[in-house]
C-alpha cells in the first residue's frame, strides 16, 4: 500500500513523458524545452508541500495529513485534465505535486514510527522495489493511452488511480502516531526543528546528497523523451528502453534490501558513490569524443550502471539522514524532503533546459552531481559528529 501511494508520484511523472511534445504543441508552448516544465512543476509542488505535511502529521496524526494531500492531488489532476493553455497546466501540475508531497513525506515518517536504522533501510528498499516497477510501466501506459485516446485521458487515469488509492489507504492502514506522541502545532517548534536538522552534519549532509542525486535524475527525466524519441529516433519504443533503465533502480533497491543488514548503510553508499563517480567521469570524456552522440548501446550501458548505483544510495541515504531525527520524524522527513527537492528542482530544470540535441548536458549533470556527492559525504564521514548506528 505504501509503495502504491509513493508510486503515484512516479505515475504522475513518467506517464506524461511520451506525451510531452504533444501536450506542449496543443497548449501553445513557445519552445520544445518548455514542455519539460510539465515535469519540473510537479517537483516544485513536492518541494513546497513537504514543508507542510511533516509538521501537520506530527500534530494531527499521519492519516489526516495524507487525506489533505490527496484532495489537492485530485484537484490538480482535474485542473490539468481541463487545461487549455500551458500556464493552467503548470498550475495543475504544481497542485498535483503539492498534494503528492503528503504520501512522499508522511510515508517516510510512518516507516520511521515503526522502524529505525538498517531495519528502516530494509523496509524502504522493499518499498522502493515495488515503487520502481511503476516508472518501468508508466511510460508504456502513457504511450498506450496516446495510441487509442487523447493525452487528456492520461490525467483521467491519474484521477481514477488517486481515488482508488485514497480509498484503500482510508480503509486498510491504521494510524501509526498515537495521540500521546503528537506535538501541538507551533511555528517556534518548526523553526527549532529546521535548525536542528540543518545543524546536524549527518542529516544535513545526507539530505544534500539526496538533493544532488535527484538533481541529476530530474535532468535525465526531463530530457529522456527528447533523447530517446528524437535523438535516438526510437519513437514508440521509447517506453521499453525507459522501462529497462527504471528496472535497474528497482533491482538495486531489492539488492540493497538483501545486503544492508550484512554490510551496513554507509559501506554500500560509499562503494556505490565512488564507483558511479568514476564511471561518470570516464563516460563524460568518451561522450565528448563522440560529439555528444554516443551509440545507443553505450548510453544504455552507462545509464544502467548509474541508475543501479543511485538505487543503492537512495534508500540508504534516506535512512541515514533520518537516523538522528526519530523524535521529530514528521517534520524531520518534511525538512529533508523539502531541502533535497529545493536543491534538485532548479538544478534539474537547468540540466533539462540545457538539452541541445546531444547527451552532454545530462551526462554532465550525472558527473558533476557525483563529484559533489563524494565531497559532501567525505565531509559527513570525516568531521566528528554523532555516529549513524548500523549493524555491519
Give the residues covered by each predicted segment.
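Extracellular/periplasmic helix-loop-helix junction of adjacent transmembrane segments
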Residues: 19-48
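Helix-breaking motifs and short loop linkers at transmembrane-helix boundaries and internal kinks
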Residues: 29, 61, 82-88, 99, ...
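Conserved MFS/SLC helix-loop-helix module at the cytosolic interface between two early adjacent transmembrane helices
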Residues: 47-87
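Structural signature of the two symmetry-related core transmembrane helices
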Residues: 64-78, 159, 268-283
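Paired small-residue
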Residues: 72-79, 87-95, 297-303
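Helix-loop-helix hairpin linking two adjacent transmembrane segments in secondary transporters
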Residues: 88, 117-118, 122-171, 177
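Cytoplasmic helix-loop-helix junction between adjacent transmembrane helices
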Residues: 92-133
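Juxtamembrane intracellular "pre-TM" segments in multi-pass secondary transporters
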Residues: 174-206
Amino acid at each position: 500500500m505504501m509503495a502504491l501511494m509513493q508510486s503515484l508520484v512516479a505515475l504522475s511523472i513518467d506517464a506524461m513523458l511520451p506525451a510531452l511534445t504533444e501536450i506542449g504543441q496543443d497548449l501553445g508552448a513557445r519552445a520544445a524545452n518548455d514542455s519539460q516544465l510539465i515535469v519540473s512543476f510537479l517537483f516544485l509542488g513536492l518541494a513546497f508541500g513537504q514543508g507542510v505535511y511533516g509538521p501537520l502529521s506530527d500534530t494531527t496524526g499521519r492519516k489526516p495529513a495524507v487525506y489533505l494531500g490527496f484532495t489537492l492531488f485530485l484537484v490538480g489532476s482535474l485542473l490539468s485534465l481541463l487545461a487549455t493553455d500551458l500556464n493552467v497546466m503548470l498550475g495543475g501540475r504544481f497542485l498535483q505535486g503539492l498534494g503528492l508531497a503528503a504520501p512522499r513525506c508522511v510515508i517516510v515518517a510512518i516507516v520511521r514510527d515503526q522502524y529505525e536504522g538498517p531495519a528502516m533501510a530494509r523496509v524502504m528498499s522493499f518499498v522502493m522495489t515495488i515503487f520502481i516497477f511503476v516508472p518501468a510501466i508508466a511510460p508504456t501506459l502513457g504511450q498506450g493511452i496516446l495510441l487509442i485516446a487523447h493525452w487528456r485521458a492520461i490525467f483521467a487515469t491519474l484521477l481514477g488511480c488517486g481515488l482508488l488509492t485514497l480509498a484503500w489507504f482510508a480503509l486498510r492502514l491504521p494510524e501509526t502516531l498515537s495521540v500521546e506522541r503528537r506535538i501541538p502545532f507551533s511555528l517556534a517548534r518548526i523553526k527549532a526543528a529546521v535548525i536542528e536538522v540543518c545543524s546536524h552534519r549527518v542529516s544535513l549532509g545526507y539530505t544534500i546528497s539526496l538533493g544532488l542525486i535527484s538533481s541529476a535524475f530530474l535532468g535525465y527525466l526531463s530530457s529522456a523523451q527528447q533523447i530517446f524519441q528524437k535523438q535516438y529516433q526510437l519513437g514508440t519504443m521509447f517506453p521499453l528502453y525507459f522501462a529497462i533503465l527504471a528496472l535497474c533502480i528497482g533491482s538495486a533497491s531489492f539488492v540493497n534490501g538483501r545486503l544492508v543488514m550484512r554490510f551496513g548503510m554507509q559501506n554500500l553508499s560509499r562503494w556505490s558513490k565512488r564507483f558511479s563517480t568514476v564511471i561518470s567521469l570516464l563516460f563524460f570524456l568518451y561522450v565528448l569524443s563522440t560529439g555528444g552522440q554516443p551509440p545507443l548501446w553505450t548510453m544504455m550501458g552507462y545509464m544502467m550502471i548509474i541508475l543501479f548505483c543511485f538505487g543503492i544510495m537512495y534508500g540508504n541515504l534516506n535512512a541515514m539522514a533520518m537516523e538522528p531525527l526519530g523524535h521529530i520524524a514528521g517534520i524531520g522527513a518534511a525538512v529533508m524532503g523539502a531541502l533535497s527537492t529545493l536543491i534538485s528542482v532548479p538544478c534539474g530544470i537547468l540540466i533539462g533546459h540545457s538539452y541541445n540535441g546531444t547527451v552532454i548536458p545530462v551526462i554532465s549533470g550525472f558527473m558533476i552531481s557525483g563529484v559533489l556527492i563524494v565531497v559532501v559525504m567525505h565531509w559527513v564521514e570525516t568531521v566528528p559528529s554523532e555516529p549513524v548506528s548500523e549493524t555491519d
